[in-house]
């Protein structure tokens, strides 16, 4: 985004902080171990997405020189991962049903619906009634408050696999209260910025599932830390999406192949977002995508498209 509407980070600022602060901070480090990047950049507050981009580039370069796939380095146990899709808020319920029908026809194994005040119970009911026993979850993007707990409890009627980030990112106590009231598992997204945040949320009972977005948490190494912590506590995780090109999609597939990623993620096919991707397109096959096996992230951008 060109404006900080989703989070405090946005594209022009990320580009600027990389050029002016983060890259120069690493320039004098010599041959840098990718596992030291986060520590070197830690004095600079925030900017996790920019830090993730830089760490991933260094990790990719290091793994390529050693002919090691990212999936192997992270500890992947699968050669393909199940794929879900996120469906935004549509003008009408018929339009929503048409969109869901199309994605199911494409082969996606899980449907996620965005919800907000005035667009929650009825669209969820319509999808459940129309499509029956599909794997269905909802994402509120922090649209609700503690005053809405009783309203959100009505979602229990629809046998959802999870309710994602219903309350504000910093309201772990509110999420814990909601989790005690409803049967639908609470999944945290924006609340989790590190393994430490995940540990606090689990200790408070604020969630039963965690969505891991590498950009949000500062990179794939921190993502693995969160995965390992959640797995140790019996908390399932899944890989969220942030409109990645094929570069980020390849790395996300490597991450999603770890053993604790037991729920389908938002790893949609390239064609959903790009007429022409920066890499060879990722395609859905039988509801799954293949994890790249080449060194590093396993793909390379088309140089002509980078001009």
Whereabouts are the PLM-identified features?
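Metal- or metallocofactor-binding catalytic centers and their adjacent structured scaffolds
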Residues: 1-65
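N-terminal amphipathic alpha-helix/helix-capping segment at the start of soluble metabolic enzymes
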Residues: 38-42, 64, 68-80, 282-284, ...
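Extended hydrophobic packing segments that form well-structured cores
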Residues: 297-307
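Metal-dependent enolase-superfamily TIM-barrel catalytic cores that perform enediolate-based chemistry
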Residues: 71-182
């Amino acid at each position: 985004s060109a404006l900080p509407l989703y989070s405090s980070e946005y594209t022009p600022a990320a580009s600027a902080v990389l050029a002016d602060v983060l890259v120069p901070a690493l320039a004098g480090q010599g041959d840098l171990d990718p596992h030291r990047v986060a520590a070197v950049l830690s004095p600079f507050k925030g900017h996790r997405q920019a830090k993730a981009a830089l760490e991933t580039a260094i990790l990719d370069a290091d793994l390529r020189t050693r002919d090691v796939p990212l999936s192997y380095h992270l500890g992947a146990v699968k050669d393909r991962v199940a794929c879900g899709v996120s469906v935004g808020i549509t003008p009408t319920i018929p339009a929503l049903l048409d969109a869901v029908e199309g994605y199911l026809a494409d082969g996606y194994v899980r449907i996620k619906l965005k919800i907000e005040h005035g667009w929650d119970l009825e669209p969820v009911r319509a999808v459940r009634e129309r499509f029956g026993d599909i794997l269905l979850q909802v994402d509120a993007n922090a649209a609700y408050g503690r005053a809405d707990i009783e309203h959100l409890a009505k979602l229990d009627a629809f046998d959802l696999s999870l309710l994602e980030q219903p309350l504000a990112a910093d309201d772990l106590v509110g999420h814990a209260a909601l989790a005690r009231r409803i049967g639908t598992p609470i999944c945290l997204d924006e609340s989790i910025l590190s393994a430490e945040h995940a540990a606090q949320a689990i200790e408070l009972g604020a969630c039963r599932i965690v969505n891991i977005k590498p950009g949000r948490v500062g990179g794939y190494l921190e993502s693995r830390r969160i995965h390992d912590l959640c797995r140790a506590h019996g908390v399932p995780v899944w890989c969220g999406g942030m409109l990645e090109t094929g570069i980020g999609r390849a790395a996300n597939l490597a991450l999603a192949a770890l053993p604790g990623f037991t729920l389908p993620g938002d790893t949609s096919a390239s064609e959903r977002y790009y007429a022409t991707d920066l890499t060879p397109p990722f395609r859905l096959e039988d509801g799954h995508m293949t994890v790249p096996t080449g060194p590093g992230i396993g793909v390379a951008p088309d140089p002509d498209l980078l001009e």
